[in-house]
Structure formats: structure tokens, C-alpha cells
């Protein structure tokens, strides 16, 4: 099928290119995560932790306050392990400079009761350790609102997903009487997380310290996975696609290049070389994964809305490679769902070409057994038997 050719006019050769993007930052260092002002994070006694949980629960389910929102972060820092001893999982002190840190007690207004009677009633049958462990678990679950809408959290609470996860994870009964979702309180918490630097700075201390957590299962389940790679679907889609089709990093980057996305692929290459390829450890906290929470200009070219075609190609590869489920289909990414039908068809065909190259062509170069273009056996009528009947010879095309 012939296509018309574009004739470029010299009159437009000196025009300044418009990309729709502002100049963004191409890197992020771990120290930036702990450089922001924060509320003071400290080890709480059991008695103080119980009070902090009650303040947090009052703010989430009864009446919101800046003090209660800060309590969510304080209790996340005081999360407990699932074993009977219930020891703290975060270090005693965060790594940030504490000269400008704010004491949460400064948020308390004299004469205001920060603990509601309903909260006292709902937790009264639980032991102190149960209150602390369950309260911190719920508090940590709200941190996803730093990157995602509060409606996702309220729906999870209404369907008892969070309560069930606590029971399953801790192998014990959920200890509180039922709290009814308060959408207004959840929305206020979401807006505070999204818009106020002190809360974000406190989150930064928590995320930096994830590398010090011996058993990260709770943190990964409750907020790590939800906050990582904010708005950058290209990163998990790329790594999943590489795993799915067995491509080299250079091979997949090359296959994805169509010229206009070269800058995106070069930024991805830079991120792979400087951060993604390095194992986490004391000298690599991998906080780049959360950078866009604190500075939206970081890795801007990797934001999905600026590289939708590339993400769509990768998502289609993963869909073909079955690295998706009914509930986590990569093609359900909002930006991809909004693409025009023609664009969806085009990117899917490109994905098929890439998938075919690495799954058939590249393998066939090393072993004829994988050359399914050249050698094909006739399938049985029910299409469940992919082996030729005895005595048959392969059909060459």
C-alpha cells in the first residue's frame, strides 16, 4: 500500500520545535529524598503508640485534623512485625537532617479532643500490641494516597480488603470493631498528602529507610508497590516484556525505536545504567522509583502520556506473553484505554512483530526446532494436539 510523501519546506527549517514538555530532570539521588523538612520520627513507647493509633483512627473515620494525618506517618514508622514479639521494623532514627523537623505535638490545639469515644469503643477489646500492630497496618495502607486517589482506599476498606489482608498476613483475627468509611476524612488526608510538603518530607524519610527493613513484606504490600514508578508505566512494562520474550536490553531498546521516541529510549537507557541495573543496598536506596512524588519534573520523558505508543507496544507484548491477569491487564492503563482505535491497532501490530522476532526469528537462528515459520506440523482438528501423527512429515511453507 503506497503512502503519500511529505515535502519539507525550507521556510520552516528554522522553526523552534514544540514538544509540549518543559525541561525535566534526568536523574535523582537518594539524598534528595531525605533533604526535605519532615515531622519528627521517633520510637514510641507502647502507651504513646496506642494513643497515636487512636488519634489516627479518629482522623480517618470521625473528624480529620492535621495532627491525625501526621499520626498516620508516625505510626507507619512504628510498624510492628507479625511475630508474637511484635518488634518495630523500621530503624530507631531516620537518616534525615533533623534540625528543621517539626514535632507533631505542635499541631495539637489546646482544648481539642483528638480521640473520639467511638474509637475508644471500637478498640477496647484489643490488647495494646494488637492496637499498635493493626493501627500501624491501617496507617501504612493510607500512604498509597500519596500517588493514587482516595477512592481506591475507601473502596478497599468498604470491601474489607485491608482488614482481610491484616488477618491473612498476621495469621490472626482483625482486632477492631467495624469502622465505617468516612469519604470526607479520606479525601482530606489525600489532599494533605498530595499538597503539603511536610507530609511529603516525612514520607521521604520512610521510603529512604525501606532498605533497612529486614522483612519488607508489609511495606511492599501496603505502599511500596503503589508508590513506585509513579506515572512511569514504561519501566515495569519494559522489564516485564524483556522477561517475557527473552530479549537483551539492547535488543528490546533497538526494536522499540522509531525515531520520534529516541529521546525517551535514551532516558530509559540512562535510568537502566545508573539505577535500575544496580542492586538495592546501603549505597543504593533506589529512591528514584518514588522521585516523581516529590518532583514531577523528574524523568518527565518517561511519563506515560509522553510515551504512550512505546508503553502500548510493551503492554501488548506483555499481554501476548501472558504477563498479565484479568485484574492487572497492562492494556487497562488509563492512557492506553483512551487511545484512538487506529493507534491501538497499529501499536498492537508492532508488538506482534517484535514478539515474533524474539520468540521465533531470533531463536530460529540458533536452532531449527524454533523456526515455526519454515517448519510447521499440521494440527489436529481439536487444536489441542500440536504433535504430528506418526509417519507424517513436516509441512514446509
UniProtKB/Swiss-Prot annotation:
<dbReference type="GO" id="GO:0019029">
    <property type="term" value="C:helical viral capsid"/>
</dbReference>
<dbReference type="GO" id="GO:1990904">
    <property type="term" value="C:ribonucleoprotein complex"/>
</dbReference>
<keyword id="KW-1139">Helical capsid protein</keyword>
<keyword id="KW-0167">Capsid protein</keyword>
<dbReference type="GO" id="GO:0019013">
    <property type="term" value="C:viral nucleocapsid"/>
</dbReference>
<dbReference type="GO" id="GO:0003723">
    <property type="term" value="F:RNA binding"/>
</dbReference>
<comment type="function">
    <text>Encapsidates the genome, protecting it from nucleases. The encapsidated genomic RNA is termed the nucleocapsid (NC) and serves as template for viral transcription and replication.</text>
</comment>
<comment type="subunit">
    <text>Homomultimerizes to form the nucleocapsid. Binds to viral genomic RNA.</text>
</comment>
<keyword id="KW-0687">Ribonucleoprotein</keyword>
<keyword id="KW-0946">Virion</keyword>
<dbReference type="Pfam" id="PF03216">
    <property type="entry name" value="Rhabdo_ncap_2"/>
</dbReference>
<protein>
    <recommendedName>
        <fullName>Nucleoprotein</fullName>
    </recommendedName>
</protein>
<keyword id="KW-0543">Viral nucleoprotein</keyword>
<dbReference type="InterPro" id="IPR004902">
    <property type="entry name" value="Rhabdo_ncap_2"/>
</dbReference>
<dbReference type="GO" id="GO:0030430">
    <property type="term" value="C:host cell cytoplasm"/>
</dbReference>
<keyword id="KW-1035">Host cytoplasm</keyword>
<keyword id="KW-0694">RNA-binding</keyword>
Amino acid at each position: 500500500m503506497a503512502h503519500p510523501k511529505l515535502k519539507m519546506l525550507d521556510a520552516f527549517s528554522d522553526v523552534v520545535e514544540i514538544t509540549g514538555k518543559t525541561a525535566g530532570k534526568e536523574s535523582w539521588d537518594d539524598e534528595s529524598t531525605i533533604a526535605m523538612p519532615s515531622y519528627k520520627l521517633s520510637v514510641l513507647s507502647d502507651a504513646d503508640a496506642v494513643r497515636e493509633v487512636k488519634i489516627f483512627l479518629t482522623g480517618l473515620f470521625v473528624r480529620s485534623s492535621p495532627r491525625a494525618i501526621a499520626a498516620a506517618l508516625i505510626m507507619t514508622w512504628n510498624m510492628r512485625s507479625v511475630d508474637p514479639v511484635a518488634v518495630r521494623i523500621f530503624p530507631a532514627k531516620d537518616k534525615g537532617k533533623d534540625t528543621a523537623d517539626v514535632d507533631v505535638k505542635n499541631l495539637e490545639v489546646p482544648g481539642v479532643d483528638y480521640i473520639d469515644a467511638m474509637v475508644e469503643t471500637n478498640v477496647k477489646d484489643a490488647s495494646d500490641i494488637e492496637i499498635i500492630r493493626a493501627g500501624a497496618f491501617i496507617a501504612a495502607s493510607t500512604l498509597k494516597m500519596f500517588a493514587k486517589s482516595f477512592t481506591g482506599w475507601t473502596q478497599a476498606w468498604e470491601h474489607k480488603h485491608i482488614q482481610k489482608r491484616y488477618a491473612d498476613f498476621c495469621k490472626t483475627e482483625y482486632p477492631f470493631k467495624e469502622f465505617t468509611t468516612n469519604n470526607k476524612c479520606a479525601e482530606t488526608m489525600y489532599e494533605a498528602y498530595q499538597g503539603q510538603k511536610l507530609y511529603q518530607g516525612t514520607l521521604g524519610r520512610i521510603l529512604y529507610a525501606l532498605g533497612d527493613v529486614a522483612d519488607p513484606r508489609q511495606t511492599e504490600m501496603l505502599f511500596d508497590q503503589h508508590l513506585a514508578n509513579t506515572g512511569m508505566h514504561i519501566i515495569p512494562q519494559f522489564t516485564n516484556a524483556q522477561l517475557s520474550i527473552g530479549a537483551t536490553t539492547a535488543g528490546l531498546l533497538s526494536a522499540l525505536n522509531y525515531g520520534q521516541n529516541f529521546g525517551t529510549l535514551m532516558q530509559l537507557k540512562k535510568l537502566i545504567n545508573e539505577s535500575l541495573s544496580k542492586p538495592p543496598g546501603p549505597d543504593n536506596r533506589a529512591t528514584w522509583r518514588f522521585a516523581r512524588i516529590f518532583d514531577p519534573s523528574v524523568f518527565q520523558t518517561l511519563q506515560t502520556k509522553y510515551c504512550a505508543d512505546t508503553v502500548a507496544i510493551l503492554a501488548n507484548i506483555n499481554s501476548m506473553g501472558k504477563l498479565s491477569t484479568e485484574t492487572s491487564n497492562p492494556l487497562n492503563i488509563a492512557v492506553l484505554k483512551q487511545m484512538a482505535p487506529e493507534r491501538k491497532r497499529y501499536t498492537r501490530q508492532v508488538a506482534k512483530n517484535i514478539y515474533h522476532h524474539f520468540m521465533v526469528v531470533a531463536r530460529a537462528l540458533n536452532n531449527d526446532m524454533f523456526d515455526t515459520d519454515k517448519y510447521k506440523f499440521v494440527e489436529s482438528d481439536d487444536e489441542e494436539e500440536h504433535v504430528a501423527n506418526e509417519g507424517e512429515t513436516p509441512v514446509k511453507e
